[in-house]
């Protein structure tokens, strides 16, 4: 050992230099694909600098205007109001009870002081309502959800399920927050299966009243927002029970909605027969007062039945324009689809905040670099680009998809077109499920991408992740919602082969089903040129081919298994395939809307930036599911390799305009409120937070 040391003497300085060189060599493997280490070239700066010198000069103002549309002013008004009121800003450390009171005061301030009246737009201008909801959720997600409970759920149920007498009586009180309310649908034993709800509303013809009862513990209304502290009313979903003159004695007319007062308007004391308990501390959204409700023979006037789709006369006669329980139930739930639309839209808002924080920090943070050269931004490392750039592209994709959803929803509210109602119902189910699931995963990626500083509560990833987590469950469990999409696709598939027509959203199945189900062209399967891979037609055709193939395969599987397992058993046996089908279809819709948004962008530089993001979104999704395309020879091995290389290159190119892309969200520092993402003196502000 001694002799070896003598033969190869090395000073401590040389040893440290060798270790540093090895580490830099290893780190170079994380750099962008074109940054190949060479003995004669620096490891980082050459390609990075040349690429930056050629990067797009993006008109940020034009891009932001195109992104944010016509409701910028109302969002800026909300941001400015809360920035001017430090007493209404949510601190990092706050108790559950204090957070609930703050959240209520925030909503009161927004409505009564700032003069923002969201309820006025729920029915008449949904696009503006959802823009308000996005801005409010950026301030505090608990506030966004509390606002949604008050106006979209409680208020929305009154104006959508009730008639003129209900709107006349309750609208102003809901609007100005005198009538705070709840949406009491979920029960301890039933959530997704709304038709299985057990709470009853029995008509008493002698007193012209309904009697609301909780028949057992499983029927206790659970997770009801606004119930634990602030709510005065509840829209209670219950089984309508009518007396009959036959041997049964009563008739179950299915689930209907009823307005039930739960607290005294003056004293705020719980009313007789109503029991309210607090659901307690939650993983997130602790500014929302979720409670549990039990009813013991609570009597309400007959007029409190929200009777748009079914009514009961003074003598107990039931009337409805819809002939069956299932049709009435479908119409009722169809009117409540706005909640899903809002959650999909709000989830994109959360994704914008998290992407902004992670990318601004990654541009600021510098670690390591070639010998005797400056350290480089961690966003110059290929591994960081791989984490964040496809996510940034996806954020834009989901933005345009949810904007489209809101537009279709607004059109539906104006026209009440039956086919459009069905279309929006399926599209909202799919986008709510897909987008919220993606955002939940992306929040963890963003937190990790910011290293140890991402773990600090003040930098918001923890609260964003915890608050958003429930988005995957409420307003419909994501797995259940995807099954609705799959069921709708199968229905359309069946109609096609029985000579029917398909609706607009699924039109590609009508137009090109035979083309997509034919054998792949062996020539185009090998094309690997950049122009071809970045051609929107190739990208959209690939997405549509996958969905069509999956649809055909799952239909055949269901038919095969139904012979031995029955319909329910066959569905369960094919469930994973059905979920994959639904996700594939939603991705196809998302890409189609992104391509359309790129095409319609009026500013050339903004359009070029969007095209980069769109290409990255499309090719990244194809690469992530490359096995599906390879299995059917839709993509040859050389083409798969070219897609992978181009995806890495596009991540590098999007990195070069990442600042402009996140700046277009126009989330000022007082909205993101994360010291590591401050646009000036971030480190200085971060040290001040901890007391230096």
Curated annotation (Swiss-Prot):
InterPro entries: ACO, ACOX_C_alpha1, Acyl-CoA_Oxase/DH_mid-dom, Acyl-CoA_Oxase/DH_mid-dom_sf, Acyl-CoA_oxidase, Acyl-CoA_oxidase_C, AcylCo_DH-like_C, AcylCoA_DH/oxidase_NM_dom_sf. It is found in: Peroxisome. Its EC number is 1.3.3.6. Gene3D superfamilies: Butyryl-CoA Dehydrogenase, subunit A, domain 2, Butyryl-CoA Dehydrogenase, subunit A, domain 3. Expressed mainly in flowers and young seedlings. Lower expression in roots, leaves and bracts. This is Acyl-coenzyme A oxidase 2, peroxisomal. Induction: Induced by dehydration and abscisic acid (ABA). Belongs to the acyl-CoA oxidase family. The lineage of its organism: Eukaryota, Viridiplantae, Streptophyta, Embryophyta, Tracheophyta. GO terms for biological process: fatty acid beta-oxidation; fatty acid beta-oxidation using acyl-CoA oxidase; long-chain fatty acid metabolic process. The active site is at residue 475. FAD binds at residues 186, 192, 225, 365, 384, 452, 473, 477. It is an enzyme of class 1 (oxidoreductase). Its main location: other. The gene is ACX2. Homodimer. Binds 1 FAD per subunit. It catalyses: a 2,3-saturated acyl-CoA + O2 = a (2E)-enoyl-CoA + H2O2. Catalyzes the desaturation of long-chain acyl-CoAs to 2-trans-enoyl-CoAs. Active on substrates longer than C14 and mostly with C18-CoA. Activity on long-chain mono-unsaturated substrates is double than with the corresponding saturated substrates. It comes from Arabidopsis thaliana (Mouse-ear cress). GO terms for cellular component: peroxisome. Its cofactor is FAD. Keywords: FAD, Fatty acid metabolism, Flavoprotein, Lipid metabolism, Oxidoreductase, Peroxisome, Transit peptide. Residues 1-49 form a transit peptide.
């Amino acid at each position: 050992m001694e002799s070896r040391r003598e033969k190869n003497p090395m000073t401590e300085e040389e040893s440290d230099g060798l270790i540093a060189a090895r580490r830099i060599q290893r780190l170079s493997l994380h750099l962008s694909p074109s940054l190949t280490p060479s003995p004669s070239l620096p490891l980082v700066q050459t390609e990075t600098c040349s690429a930056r010198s050629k990067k797009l000069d993006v008109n940020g103002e034009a891009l932001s205007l195109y992104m944010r549309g016509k409701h910028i002013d109302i969002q800026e008004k909300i941001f400015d109001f809360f920035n001017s009121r430090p007493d209404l800003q949510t601190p990092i450390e706050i108790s559950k009870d204090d957070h609930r009171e703050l959240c209520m005061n925030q909503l009161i301030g927004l409505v009564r002081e700032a003069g923002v009246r969201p309820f006025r737009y729920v029915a008449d201008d949904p696009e503006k309502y959802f823009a308000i909801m996005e801005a409010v959720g950026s301030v505090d997600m608990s506030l966004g959800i509390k606002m949604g409970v008050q106006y979209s759920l409680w208020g929305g149920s009154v104006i959508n399920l009730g008639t003129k007498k209900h709107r006349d009586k309750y609208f102003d009180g809901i609007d100005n927050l005198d009538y705070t309310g709840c949406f009491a649908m979920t029960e301890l034993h039933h959530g997704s299966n709304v038709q299985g709800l057990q709470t009853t509303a029995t008509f008493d013809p002698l007193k012209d009243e309904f009697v609301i009862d909780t028949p057992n513990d499983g029927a206790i209304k659970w997770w009801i927002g606004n119930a634990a502290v602030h709510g005065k009313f509840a829209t209670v979903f219950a089984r309508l029970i009518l007396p009959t003159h036959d041997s049964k004695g009563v008739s179950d007319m299915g689930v209907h909605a009823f307005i039930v007062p739960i607290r005294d308007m003056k004293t705020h004391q719980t009313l007789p027969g109503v029991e309210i308990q607090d659901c307690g501390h939650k993983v997130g959204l602790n500014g929302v007062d979720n409670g549990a409700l039990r009813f013991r023979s609570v009597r309400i006037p007959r007029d409190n039945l929200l009777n748009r789709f079914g009514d009961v006369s003074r003598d107990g006669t039931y009337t409805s324009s819809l002939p069956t329980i299932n049709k009435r139930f479908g119409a009722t739930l169809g009117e409540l689809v706005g909640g899903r639309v809002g959650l999909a839209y709000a989830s994109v808002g959360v994704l914008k905040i998290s992407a902004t924080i992670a990318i601004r920090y990654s541009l600021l943070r510098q670690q390591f670099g070639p010998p005797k050269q400056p350290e480089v931004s961690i966003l110059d490392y290929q591994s960081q680009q791989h984490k964040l750039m496809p996510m940034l592209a996806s954020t834009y994709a989901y933005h345009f998809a949810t904007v489209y959803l809101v537009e279709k929803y607004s059109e539906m509210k104006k026209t009440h077109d039956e086919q459009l109602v069905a279309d929006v119902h399926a599209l909202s189910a799919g986008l709510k499920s897909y987008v919220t699931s993606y955002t939940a995963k992306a929040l963890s990626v963003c937190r990790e991408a910011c290293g140890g500083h991402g773990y600090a509560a003040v930098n918001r990833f923890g609260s964003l992740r915890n608050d958003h987590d429930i988005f995957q469950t409420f307003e419909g469990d994501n797995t259940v919602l995807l099954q609705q999409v799959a069921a709708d696709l199968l229905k359309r598939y069946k109609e096609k082969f029985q000579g029917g027509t398909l609706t607009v959203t699924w039109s590609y199945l009508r137009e090109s089903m035979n083309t997509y189900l034919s054998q792949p062209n062996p020539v185009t399967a090998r094309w690997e040129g950049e122009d071809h891979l970045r051609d929107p037609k190739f990208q959209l055709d690939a997405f549509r081919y996958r969905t069509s193939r999956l649809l055909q395969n799952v239909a055949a599987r269901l038919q095969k298994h139904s012979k031995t397992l029955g319909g329910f058993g066959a569905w369960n046996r094919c469930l994973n395939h059905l979920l994959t089908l639904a996700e594939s279809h939603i991705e196809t819709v998302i890409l189609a809307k992104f391509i359309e948004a790129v095409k319609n962008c009026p500013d050339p530089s903004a359009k070029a930036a969007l095209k980069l993001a769109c290409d990255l979104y499309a090719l990244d999704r194809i690469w992530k599911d490359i096995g599906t395309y390879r299995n059917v020879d839709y993509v040859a091995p050389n083409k798969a390799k070219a897609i992978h290389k181009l995806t890495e290159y596009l991540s590098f190119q999007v990195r070069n305009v990442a600042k402009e892309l996140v700046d277009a969200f126009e989330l000022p520092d007082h909205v993101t409120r994360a010291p590591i993402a401050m646009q000036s003196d971030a480190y200085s502000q971060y040290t001040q937070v901890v007391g230096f």
